[in-house]
């Protein structure tokens, strides 16, 4: 009998049911000859490229390092020849492109038994293999550094944002690597694993070397920041690490095989996908290979590297992000023209305020497009944010203090325990149409510079 961990019930939040959820079936992927790693996938990173065009790299060899902490490197997903280091304005590194070898060659870091490793051994192994940068931290919601001392490590296996991939489906066949990754992290600090009330995989409910907590409630119960807030909040001067569950699998593969394997199971979802499902693809795979012949016709499409709430706008030339668990396709909406807007009675549109009759239809699935349906306007203090943000903070006052640049007020209002994704739902329901995630990201970046 597995004794279930403590259950935390959340009332605040909002589940947005969209059409096009990924079916639990595997889809074919056309093999790619070119891959790329994007530094912007790792927030807080200032990259310094360590390879040149024409260099040959193995899977696991470093492509770039963090200029502020050069021992943190970032591994190539494939072996091959570096074809380009693409740069943007002010020579910002946009991506490092690699032409893949036909026969893949892996850097060998040696199989290790994590049970006999120390915390320093685990850190050294992740640093050597270029995987340490997949660990994020609070405060600031950035890629962490090895000299930070976390009071705890949080892993959330609950993905509950609209159209997000199901981690239990991704976990099939990866249970051993997942447990090895958890055990390795537990050598560094206490690990809290957050799971959903409907998740039943034994690799989650019976995970060893961690404290399992069940979160029962609507989105954003799966946000790791929400889980931190309810289990062990971050105060000024404290640090917690947060790790994506797929990155835990990456770590486990490293210790079990001695190789860097950045293959992840990604959901292909959204109303503009012909056939929804899952693909196994490497980080850095071009989206045109993942989405080949699977984009529906009929209107302009918005491709998202991620989910509709927190995903990054992409195109077919973009590559699969390092932390991306789904690729989502929704209508752009730029070819839709309506009169009278919200004044018309509507039977297909979603409303959080019950302005339309659709709330009477229960758990109806909606086909929403990417339109804002309104312009940015003055901030309205209406309590909208608090209704969908189950955290013990004054969210509206925090946003106002970030906009005004009042750092003392930000610290008092709890900025150290938030990340941009925590405000994704608030951004969705916001009557003022403010880019809340962007505001929070800029506020955290300014605060980090002030405290440096």
Which residue stretches match the model-derived regions?
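N-terminal, Lys/Arg-enriched amphipathic/low-complexity engagement segments
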Residues: 2-50, 65, 215
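Glycine-rich, histidine-containing beta strand-loop boundary motifs that form or position
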Residues: 61, 67, 78, 86, ...
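Buried, small/hydrophobic-residue-enriched core segments of structured protein domains
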Residues: 72, 86-452
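Short, solvent-exposed loop/turn positions at domain surfaces
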Residues: 45, 51, 68-71, 275
């Amino acid at each position: 009998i597995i004794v279930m961990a403590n259950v935390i019930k959340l009332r605040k939040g909002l589940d947005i049911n969209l059409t096009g959820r990924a079916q639990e079936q595997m889809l074919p992927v056309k093999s790619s000859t070119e891959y790329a790693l994007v530094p912007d996938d790792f927030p807080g990173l200032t990259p310094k490229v360590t390879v040149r065009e024409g260099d040959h790299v193995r899977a696991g060899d470093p492509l770039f390092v963090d200029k502020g902490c050069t021992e943190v490197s970032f591994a190539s997903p494939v072996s091959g020849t570096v074809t380009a280091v693409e740069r943007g304005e002010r020579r910002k590194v946009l991506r490092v492109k690699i032409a893949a070898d036909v026969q893949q060659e892996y850097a060998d870091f040696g199989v290790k038994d994590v049970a006999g490793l120390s915390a320093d051994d685990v850190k050294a192994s992740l640093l050597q293999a270029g995987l340490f940068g997949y660990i994020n931290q609070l405060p600031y919601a950035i890629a962490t550094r090895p000299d930070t001392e976390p009071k705890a490590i949080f892993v959330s296996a609950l993905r509950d944002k609209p159209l997000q991939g199901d981690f239990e489906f991704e976990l099939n066949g990866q249970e051993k690597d997942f447990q090895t990754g958890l055990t390795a992290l537990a050598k560094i600090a206490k690990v809290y694993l957050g799971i959903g009330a409907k998740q039943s995989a034994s690799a989650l409910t019976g995970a060893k070397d961690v404290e399992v907590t069940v979160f029962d409630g609507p989105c954003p119960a799966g946000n790791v920041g929400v889980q931190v807030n309810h289990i062990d909040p971050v105060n000024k001067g404290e640090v917690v690490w947060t790790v994506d569950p797929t990155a835990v699998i990456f770590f486990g593969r490293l210790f079990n095989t001695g190789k860097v394997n950045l293959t992840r199971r990604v959901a292909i979802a959204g109303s503009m996908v012909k056939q929804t499902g899952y693909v196994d693809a490497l980080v850095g795979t071009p989206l045109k290979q993942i989405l080949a012949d699977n984009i529906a016709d009929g209107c302009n499409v918005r491709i998202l590297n991620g989910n509709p709430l927190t995903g990054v706008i992409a195109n077919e030339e973009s590559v699969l992000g390092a932390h991306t668990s789904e690729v989502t396709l929704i209508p752009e909406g730029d070819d839709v023209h309506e009169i009278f807007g919200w004044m018309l009675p509507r039977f297909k549109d979603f409303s959080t305020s019950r302005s339309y009759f659709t709330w009477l239809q229960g758990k109806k699935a909606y086909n929403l497009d990417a339109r804002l349906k309104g312009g940015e306007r003055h901030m309205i203090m209406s309590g909208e944010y608090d209704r969908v943000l189950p955290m013990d903070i004054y969210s509206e006052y925090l946003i106002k203090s970030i906009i005004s640049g009042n750092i003392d007020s930000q610290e008092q209002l709890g900025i150290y325990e938030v990340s941009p994704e925590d405000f994704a739902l608030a951004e969705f329901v916001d009557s003022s149409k403010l880019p809340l995630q962007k505001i929070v990201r800029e506020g955290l970046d300014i605060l980090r510079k002030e405290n440096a």
